[in-house]
Amino acid sequence: MEPVDPRLEPWKHPGSQPKTACTNCYCKKCCFHCQVCFITKGLGISYGRKKRRQRRRAPPDSEVHQVSLPKQPASQPQGDPTGPKESKKKVERETETDPVH
């Protein structure tokens, strides 16, 4: 290895910079172009500020078209309040007395 001038900053050392500039391309060759390209393109790591996505707001006149739903009555227990056993017996009795079917 060649001796490096100690007065040079580390990012200006020979061989520290690639000969070609970085591009926006994401092909395999460009992803392995340099360490920065590998980290940002290959691994997808970026430490820049994240852009806040703006919510798509509805037009102001869209509120007119919304119809308020009527309040539903409180839930009532469905089925026979006497219990499942008695209701089964009741159904059996009705089927016995109904000769139509």
Swiss-Prot record:
Region Disordered, residue ranges:
48-101
Q: Where is the composition biased (Basic residues)?
A: 48-57
Major place of residence = host cell
Which InterPro entries does the entry link to? IV_Tat, Tat_dom_sf
**Cross-link Glycyl lysine isopeptide (Lys-Gly) (interchain with G-Cter in ubiquitin) per UniProt, renumbered positions:** 71
One cellular component GO annotation, for this chain's record?
extracellular region
UniProt keywords (A-Z) are: Acetylation, Activator, AIDS, Apoptosis, Host cytoplasm, Host nucleus, Host-virus interaction, Inhibition of host innate immune response by virus, Inhibition of host interferon signaling pathway by virus, Interferon antiviral system evasion, Isopeptide bond, Metal-binding, Methylation, Modulation of host chromatin by virus, Modulation of host PP1 activity by virus, Phosphoprotein, RNA-binding, Secreted, Transcription, Transcription regulation, Ubl conjugation, Viral immunoevasion, Zinc
Q: Where is this motif: Nuclear localization signal, RNA-binding (TAR), and protein transduction?
A: 49-57
Cysteine-rich: annotated span? 22-37
* Positions bearing Asymmetric dimethylarginine: 52-53
- Gene3D superfamilies in the cross-refs: Tat domain
- Feature type site, description Essential for Tat translocation through the endosomal membrane: 11
The entry marks the following residues as binding Zn(2+) 2, namely 25, 27, 30
What does the record give under GO molecular function? actinin binding; cyclin binding; metal ion binding; protein domain specific binding; protein serine/threonine phosphatase inhibitor activity; RNA-binding transcription regulator activity; trans-activation response element binding
Spans annotated as Core: 38-48
What does the protein in this record do?
Transcriptional activator that increases RNA Pol II processivity, thereby increasing the level of full-length viral transcripts. Recognizes a hairpin structure at the 5'-LTR of the nascent viral mRNAs referred to as the transactivation responsive RNA element (TAR) and recruits the cyclin T1-CDK9 complex (P-TEFb complex) that will in turn hyperphosphorylate the RNA polymerase II to allow efficient elongation. The CDK9 component of P-TEFb and other Tat-activated kinases hyperphosphorylate the C-terminus of RNA Pol II that becomes stabilized and much more processive.
- Belongs to which family? Belongs to the lentiviruses Tat family.
Question: HAMAP family under this entry?
Answer: HIV_TAT
Q: What is this protein called?
A: Protein Tat
Q: Which organism is it from?
A: Human immunodeficiency virus type 1 group M subtype B (isolate SF162)
Instruction: Give the source lineage, highest ranks first.
Output: Viruses, Riboviria, Pararnavirae, Artverviricota, Revtraviricetes
Q: Which gene encodes it?
A: tat
